[in-house]
From Swiss-Prot:
Compartment list: Cytoplasm
Protein name, entry field: Threonylcarbamoyl-AMP synthase
Sequence ranges assigned to domain YrdC-like in this UniProt record: 7-190
Gene name of the record: tsaC
Any one Gene Ontology BP term: regulation of translational fidelity
Chief site of localization: cytoplasm
Family classification: Belongs to the SUA5 family. TsaC subfamily.
Biological role stated in the UniProt entry: Required for the formation of a threonylcarbamoyl group on adenosine at position 37 (t(6)A37) in tRNAs that read codons beginning with adenine. Catalyzes the conversion of L-threonine, HCO(3)(-)/CO(2) and ATP to give threonylcarbamoyl-AMP (TC-AMP) as the acyladenylate intermediate, with the release of diphosphate.
Catalytic activities: L-threonine + hydrogencarbonate + ATP = L-threonylcarbamoyladenylate + diphosphate + H2O
UniProt keyword annotations, A-Z: ATP-binding, Cytoplasm, Nucleotide-binding, Nucleotidyltransferase, Transferase, tRNA processing
GO cellular component, one term: cytoplasm
Length: 190
């Protein structure tokens, strides 16, 4: 990976995030679309772009726990549940956790939970560290279509000027597993 090209694309993506725009970036298994989770405008743009219902809720991805802690109602998590999450993080595991009562419905959808993941992927770590907070993360595709696996796929599907962080997807062959930490149910396992 060209360090200069990566840094140039990182700066461009961070600027877009601050401007409440949507970006694409490589994740563990595919390219993702992301935006600032604190911006209703940005999240609604992302949902419109994907043609995704607000009722479904979204995933937040972070480089460390402090970036997602404010979204979680920790009083509803046991020590064992936290231990389970930290055992699997950083990595390709997303957990549905009780949402803090202040988390907006544009993130939780129709649920009282929020989906969170701490990633081990270089690109996500860099993005979240430089941006200083978690990102909304969803697959780079129109709902019910195949996800983008390369930068070229993203540019083909979303336009040649779409901001894409330079890099490659990780070695996972499927999207992250989603586990409801409260009841232990596996929501998504492909």
């Amino acid at each position: 990976m060209s360090k200069d090209y990566f840094l140039s694309s990182l700066i461009k993506c961070i600027r877009k995030l601050y401007d409440k725009k949507i970006i694409a970036y490589p994740t563990e298994a595919m390219f993702g679309l992301g935006c600032d989770p604190t911006s209703e405008k940005a999240v609604k743009r992302l949902l419109d772009l994907k043609k995704r219902s607000i009722k479904k809720g979204l995933i937040l991805v972070a480089s460390n726990y402090n970036q997602i802690k404010m979204y979680i109602n920790e009083s509803k998590l046991s020590a064992q549940q936290k231990k389970t999450m930290f055992f699997h993080w950083p990595g390709p595991y997303t957990f549905l956790v009780p949402a803090n009562s202040l988390v907006p419905c544009w993130l939780t959808g129709q649920f009282d939970t929020i989906a969170v993941r701490i990633s081990a992927h270089f690109s996500i770590i860099k993005l979240c560290n430089v941006f200083g907070k978690a990102l909304v993360s969803t697959s780079a595709n129109i709902s019910n279509m195949s996800p983008c696996l390369t930068r070229e796929d993203v540019l083909k599907d979303f336009g040649k000027d779409f901001p894409v962080l330079y890099g490659h997807i990780g070695n996972e062959s499927h999207p992250s597993k989603i586990i409801n930490i409260v009841n232990g149910k596996l929501i998504r396992y492909v």
